[in-house]
Amino acid sequence: MPFVTIQFLEGRTDDQKKALVSEVTEVVAKNLKAPKENIHVILEEMKKTDYGVGGVRKSDI
C-alpha cells in the first residue's frame, strides 16, 4: 500500500491537483506493480507565508 506525499506552494488549480493525483498514481502503479486502488496520494499545499528559502518567505518575494 504505497503512500506518496507531495508538498507544494499554494496557487495550483483544482484541475492541476486532480491531474497530479491521477498521473502520480499511474507512475507508481506501473513502477511498483501495485493496484491503483491501493495507492494513496497526499497533497500538502503550503501558504506562501508559511514557507521560506534563504531566510525569506515566499510571500515576500
Curated annotation (Swiss-Prot):
Record: active site: 2
Gene3D superfamilies, A to Z: Macrophage Migration Inhibitory Factor
Domain of life: Bacteria
CDD domains membership: 4Oxalocrotonate_Tautomerase (cd00491)
Molecular functions per Gene Ontology: isomerase activity
Catalytic activity, EC: 5.3.2.-
Protein keywords: Isomerase
Top-tier EC class: isomerase
SUPFAM superfamilies according to UniProt: Tautomerase/MIF
InterPro entries per record: 4-OT, 4-OT-like_dom, Tautomerase/MIF_sf
Family: Belongs to the 4-oxalocrotonate tautomerase family.
Protein known as: Probable tautomerase LMOf2365_2536
